[in-house]
Amino acid sequence: MALPNINQNLTDTHSAEQKTPETKQVLPSLSQDETIEQIIGGFGWSQFLQALLVSVPTLIDAQQIFISIFADAHPKWHCNLNATCSPKSNICELPKSAWYWVDSSHKTIISEWGLECASSFIMGLPASSFFLGCLIGGFTLAIFGDFWLGRRKLLYLSCLTMCLASLLTAFSVNIWMYSALRLISGFGRAPIISCSLIFLTERVGKRWRGQIGSIGFFSYAVGLMSLSAIAYLNRGSSWRKLYLYTSISSISFCIMTYFFVYESPRWLFMQGRDKEAVDVLRGIASIPVKSLDLYTSVRLNLINNLIGFIP
């Protein structure tokens, strides 16, 4: 019986090993959004605080939209005891001596400036001016924000413009000045809701976007309720105080957004400001950047040429 040629078998095995192609580890193909998603992770305390900060402007926005319900309202009036009139009478057909305002004559702009018999154009001018400002601001400020200002500065400037205009509204001397300032206020508030929602969804991973987005709407509801509470406490007083109370406190919150809110990392990447984008991701990430897996770290370097920036 012939014995197998051991040397020949070893030679064949060695040749087969040489012909076997090398196995290479291939990094998974990740888009820039997927890379950012992996870095941001889930939901942490830093992201929660950022969500609260960017939700405050929606609270202020709700107050400034609906403040006219109280400031521009028709106050109640009564007939004088010695006058021949009834509550169902047309106030415009009665002499001034036949009736009086129930509360202070400075409670609303109607009673202070004697607009009870003004035309429908004059009566609707403040509200129309406000929403005209919203229309103009929606077109112009969005362009400035995407190309030059950035989303953080846009949110800050929009909120500050709205609040400063609201503060100046308290010192209006007539309906024309009042309407002009309402137009500026509407111009400033136009991009606030969209900016806040974008910031909210960018701060967390996809799993939490539905829950975190509701914070903005909750803040908006709080703004409505707080405005009603302020108006109730201010009942009988001048409408000017209502603008002062809502604007002075709001200006401080607007300033906080400039110093404590991070810029959008996606916008920074689009502008080529890669190092700043990585610093932002490091600040808002729910997991330490050092503990990122190999694929995510390498992919971020390949996409944005950031080798040397990530520790």
Where do the language-model regions lie?
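Central mid-sequence intracellular linker of multi-pass
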Residues: 2-10, 72-97, 211, 234-303
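Hydrophobic transmembrane alpha-helices of multi-pass solute transporters/permeases
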Residues: 2-94, 111-142, 146, 151-155, ...
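Glycine-rich segments within core transmembrane alpha-helices of 12-TM secondary carriers
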Residues: 57-61, 132-134, 189-193, 204-258
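Transmembrane alpha-helix boundary/hinge residues in polytopic small-molecule transporters
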Residues: 67-70, 140, 179, 191-196, ...
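Helix-breaking motifs and short loop linkers at transmembrane-helix boundaries and internal kinks
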Residues: 149-150, 171-176, 188, 205
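C-terminal ends and interior cores of transmembrane alpha-helices
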Residues: 160-173, 228, 232-233
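Helix-loop junctions at membrane interfaces in 12-TM secondary transporters
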Residues: 170-180, 235-238
